[in-house]
């Protein structure tokens, strides 16, 4: 099985909260698609609560679009990581890590302004697969933690696992 790009970086050295360009690719028409690793917590050290990350999923995607989309950037998708340490964001364009960090900061400020659980978009059984699994309080706590810590940048060349280690870790 081919090794996915996200498994070629050393998760023990990742900073959080931090932005990382996980992948850049070109479409056949020449558009740039960039995938960002938006790491909320340090891998293997902390984990986002299930209700908090789910509520953030509903809020964060809209807020990030509000702050980052523009003439040269259009967000395709923002999805939580299975490990619950952050989100992956796929978009058309190539914004800088600092632009993404600024939009992320503004989005966390927006999360703190949400007044009540009934203001969470698509929180109903028709539009959400687990409508009972939400907590605005937990989402706000995550947002406060991000704002208090500040957002840095993780660079792939600083996190790359050596080839010898990748071979040693490979599962056949």
Swiss-Prot record:
It catalyses: S-(5-deoxy-D-ribos-5-yl)-L-homocysteine = (S)-4,5-dihydroxypentane-2,3-dione + L-homocysteine. Its cofactor is Fe cation. Pfam families: LuxS. Belongs to the LuxS family. Transmembrane segments: none annotated. The keyword Ion transport does not apply. The gene is luxS. Binds 1 Fe cation per subunit. Fe cation binds at residues 54, 58, 128. InterPro entries: LuxS_sf, Metalloenz_LuxS/M16, S-ribosylhomocysteinase. GO terms for molecular function: iron ion binding; S-ribosylhomocysteine lyase activity. It comes from Vibrio vulnificus (strain YJ016). The keyword Iron applies. Keywords: Autoinducer synthesis, Iron, Lyase, Metal-binding, Quorum sensing. The lineage of its organism: Bacteria, Pseudomonadati, Pseudomonadota, Gammaproteobacteria, Vibrionales. This is S-ribosylhomocysteine lyase. Involved in the synthesis of autoinducer 2 (AI-2) which is secreted by bacteria and is used to communicate both the cell density and the metabolic potential of the environment. The regulation of gene expression in response to changes in cell density is called quorum sensing. Catalyzes the transformation of S-ribosylhomocysteine (RHC) to homocysteine (HC) and 4,5-dihydroxy-2,3-pentadione (DPD). Its EC number is 4.4.1.21. GO terms for biological process: quorum sensing. Homodimer.
